[in-house]
């Protein structure tokens, strides 16, 4: 079943909005929440196979339903995922920290911002 899902993941963009949203929410949850590395990496791999332009729009609309952005551990997992998807999504994810009173969230955003600068200097 795993091969069928990953080979057909690109078909999600052709599903109805309700169905595609449920699939993306589930993949977001598994990409950012669990501690089981296989679930994290498999979900990220599936998401990375989708059109980043389409996916960025979906994620921005759905992330708060699947990921506890106010938890620093889940927020870091979300930034890791965003880094894989696109610079636009990562920038948006980093900007979320502006509204946080949690110093660990702010620190995570700063860490990823520094990584962006470092990666562009290479």
Residue ranges and their predicted role:
Residues 2, 35-36, 70-71, 101-106:
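Short inter-helical turns and helix N-cap capping residues of alpha-solenoid HEAT/ARM repeat scaffolds
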Residues 3-17, 40-53, 73-85, 107-116:
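Structural detector for internal amphipathic alpha-helices that build alpha-solenoid repeat scaffolds
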Residues 8-13, 26-45, 59-64:
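Short charge-dense sequence patches
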Residues 13-14, 29-33, 48, 67-68, ...:
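Alpha-solenoid HEAT/Armadillo repeat architecture
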Residues 17-30, 53-65, 87-98, 119-122:
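Amphipathic alpha-helical scaffolding segments comprising HEAT/armadillo-like alpha-solenoid repeats
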Residues 60-65, 71-77:
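Short, local alpha-helical segments
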Residues 97, 101-122:
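Short, intrinsically disordered, low-complexity segments enriched in Ser/Thr and Pro
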């Amino acid at each position: 079943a795993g091969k069928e899902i990953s080979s057909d993941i690109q078909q999600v963009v052709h599903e109805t909005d309700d169905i595609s949203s449920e699939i993306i929410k589930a993949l977001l949850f598994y990409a950012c929440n669990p501690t089981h590395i296989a679930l994290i990496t498999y979900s990220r791999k599936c998401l990375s196979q989708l059109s980043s332009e389409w996916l960025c729009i979906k994620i921005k609309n759905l992330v708060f339903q699947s990921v506890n952005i106010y938890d620093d551990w889940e927020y870091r997992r979300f930034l890791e995922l965003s880094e894989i998807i696109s610079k636009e999504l990562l920038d948006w994810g980093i900007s979320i920290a502006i509204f946080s009173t949690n110093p660990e969230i702010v620190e995570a955003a700063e860490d990823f911002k520094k990584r962006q600068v470092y990666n562009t200097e290479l």
